[in-house]
């Protein structure tokens, strides 16, 4: 997934089933990458601040399988949806120099074999806004802005593959106020939303 914010390109890179590689800040899998639009490296990326050992283009680590990414026109934050393993899908924010914890954390899910991965969350790692256990196979995300459903402005609309649903999440200060299923199972797996 790609997002442009303030002349920077943010790129997601899944961990491709390699697990702990998402904790390796010298490799791209399991990370969020941030570069300038001309392909050069921003001099305010984490490597040039307090993460001296990180690759210069890495902005955040510890994601498993990012599915959607969207820039909010309301708070200028980048929001992300991510597949867990067997459970542990989540919706959260992209944050400078932080770590979502895959595969130290399991976000509430388990390995496909049924064995435990790790805790849902623990201090020192980025906490998601919303987790789904069991997995709904989150996919695309957008932050709604428009006149058709004015009361939805600022809410996240998230699609689902496995659950075949469109969900609306009202949230504030990184906390869910409510989640509503707009529809489910009507049109099959939903990959994208605009």
PLM regions with names:
Residues 15-180, 188:
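Beta-propeller domain segments
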């Amino acid at each position: 997934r790609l997002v442009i914010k303030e002349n920077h390109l943010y790129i997601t890179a899944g961990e491709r089933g390699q697990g702990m590689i998402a904790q390796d800040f010298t490799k791209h899998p399991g990370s969020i990458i941030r570069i300038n639009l001309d392909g050069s490296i921003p001099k305010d990326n984490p490597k040039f601040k307090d993460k001296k050992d990180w690759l210069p283009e890495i902005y955040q680590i510890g994601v498993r399988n990012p599915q959607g990414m969207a820039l909010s026109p309301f708070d200028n934050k980048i929001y992300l949806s991510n597949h867990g393993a067997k459970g542990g899908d989540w919706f959260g924010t992209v944050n400078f120099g932080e770590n979502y914890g895959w595969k130290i954390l399991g976000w509430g899910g388990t390995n496909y074999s049924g064995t435990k991965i790790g805790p849902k969350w623990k201090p020192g790692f980025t906490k998601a806004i919303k987790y789904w256990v069991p997995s709904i196979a989150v996919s695309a995300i957008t932050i709604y802005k428009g006149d058709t459903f004015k009361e939805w402005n600022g809410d996240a609309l998230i699609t689902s593959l496995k659950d075949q649903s469109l969900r609306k999440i009202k949230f504030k200060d990184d906390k869910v106020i409510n989640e509503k299923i707009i529809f489910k199972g009507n049109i099959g797996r939903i990959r994208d939303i605009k």
